[in-house]
A protein has these predicted regions:
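Hydrophobic alpha-helical segments
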Residues: 1-97
Length: 97
């Protein structure tokens, strides 16, 4: 199946998961895989499964440990990882049809 957006996704993944940032590359990769450290597990799981339910209070609870830039990267890595997994699952179904 042709994937005309693969190069764009790869560039996004490279910048997000392997580029410089306020958080470590390792942390962003763990989060994208759905394997965050314990202090982030609740937020990351919520983003990956029910992002629409995340509230300011959920994020505020982490502000004592993480900067605004770090929280942004954490949230984006969680959303990107979930999106990648869903896209991969959908492509497998379509290719099997």
């Amino acid at each position: 199946m042709d994937d005309r957006f693969a190069a764009l996704r790869d560039a996004t993944a490279s910048a997000l998961l392997r580029g410089p940032g306020a958080t470590s590359v390792e942390l962003r990769q763990l989060i994208a895989r759905g394997e965050p450290p314990p202090d982030l597990s609740s937020l990351v799981e919520q983003i990956r499964s029910h992002a629409y339910t995340v509230t300011n209070e959920d994020v505020d609870a982490l502000r004592a440990r993480y900067t605004e830039e770090q929280l942004f990267e954490i949230i984006v890595a969680a959303a990107f990882g979930a999106a990648q997994e869903r896209l991969s699952a959908a492509r497998r179904v379509l290719e099997g049809a």
